[in-house]
From Swiss-Prot:
Swiss-Prot/TrEMBL domain comment: The recognition loop recognizes a hydrophobic patch at the surface of interacting dehydrogenases and acts as a static anchor at the interface.
Residues with N-acetylalanine modification: A2
Its biological purpose: Heterodimeric electron transfer flavoprotein that accepts electrons from several mitochondrial dehydrogenases, including acyl-CoA dehydrogenases, glutaryl-CoA and sarcosine dehydrogenase. It transfers the electrons to the main mitochondrial respiratory chain via ETF-ubiquinone oxidoreductase. Required for normal mitochondrial fatty acid oxidation and normal amino acid metabolism. ETFB binds an AMP molecule that probably has a purely structural role.
Taxon lineage: Eukaryota, Metazoa, Chordata, Craniata, Vertebrata
Swiss-Prot/TrEMBL keywords: Acetylation, Electron transport, Methylation, Mitochondrion, Nucleotide-binding, Phosphoprotein, Transport
Species of provenance: Rattus norvegicus
Gene Ontology MF term list: electron transfer activity; nucleotide binding
Main location (coarse class): mitochondrion
Annotated compartments: Mitochondrion matrix
Post-translational modification: Methylated. Trimethylation at Lys-200 and Lys-203 may negatively regulate the activity in electron transfer from acyl-CoA dehydrogenases.
Protein name (record): Electron transfer flavoprotein subunit beta
Annotated region described as Recognition loop, given as residue ranges: 183-205
Length: 255
């Protein structure tokens, strides 16, 4: 049991507290000079892997991120939380903006095979695109069982029991290892990295590779046509009678 190895995917996203601004040309959102941090659901995935290691159920945790050089900051955060080493799949800025779930899933699948891991943890979704697809696609490419929206994870020999949130309740499933698990909000509360661990993380190894080294083509067949802010919500108007209501609706062209 103690020989299990876990790969945890972490994504660098605009910090959840930042007000998003759309670029003037509507090609995307403004990222220059904007605070970034680890995707909150990825933090939960890292925390769960670390807890399993603390129980001596996992031997090694590898944190991986795809994107520009700044992604190494996100990997360092995972290392400070308790991951053992990192892998940075370097993708240039312009190409990184077009990375979709399928491209990342291909990278993760190759790394999972290369590193011979038993568990692949991801956040259930990222707060920037909210796709909720990468974990499922990775499991499909690997032909591994998957436990998505996990709210509880328990290792049982060569299986992992996952309690997952579904519409109207909870579902409990058992997956034969190796398996893919995506973390939901209620799985755990991630720890804050302590200063000593932050200092230790600076000495931990981060391997830098390119997608081509894995034989992965990052070309996307999906392109963003336009990104727009939601329309501003207009203030309501109080009316005294039904007749006034009908007149107002006619005035604004609703009837």
């Amino acid at each position: 049991m103690a020989e299990l190895r876990a790969l945890v995917a972490v994504k660098r996203v605009i910090d959840f507290a930042v007000k998003i601004r759309v670029k003037p040309d509507k090609s995307g959102v403004v990222t220059d000079g904007v605070k970034h941090s680890m995707n909150p659901f990825c933090e939960i995935a890292v925390e769960e892997a670390v807890r399993l290691k603390e129980k001596k159920l996992v031997k090694e945790i590898i944190a991986v991120s795809c994107g520009p050089p700044q992604c190494q900051e996100t990997i360092r955060t995972a290392l400070a939380m308790g991951a053992d080493r990192g892998i940075h799949v370097e993708v240039p800025g312009a190409e990184a903006e077009n990375l979709g779930p399928l491209q990342v899933a291909r990278v993760l699948a190759k790394l999972a095979e290369k590193e011979k891991v038993d568990l692949l943890f991801l956040g259930k979704q990222a707060i920037d695109d909210d796709c909720n697809q990468t974990g499922q696609m990775t499991a499909g490419l690997l032909d591994w069982p998957q436990g998505t929206f996990a709210s509880q994870v328990t290792l049982e020999g060569d299986k992992v029991k996952v309690e997952r949130e579904i519409d109207g309740g909870l579902e409990t499933i058992r997956l034969k290892l190796p398996a893919v698990v995506t973390a939901d909000l209620r799985l755990n509360e991630p720890r804050y990295a302590t200063l000593p661990n932050i200092m230790k993380a600076k000495k931990k190894k981060i391997e830098v590779i390119k997608a081509g080294d894995l034989g992965v083509d990052l070309t996307s067949k999906v392109s963003v046509i336009s990104v727009e802010e939601p329309p501003q919500r207009l203030a309501g108007v109080k009316v005294e009678t039904t007749e006034d209501l009908v007149a107002k609706l006619k005035e604004v062209g609703r009837i």
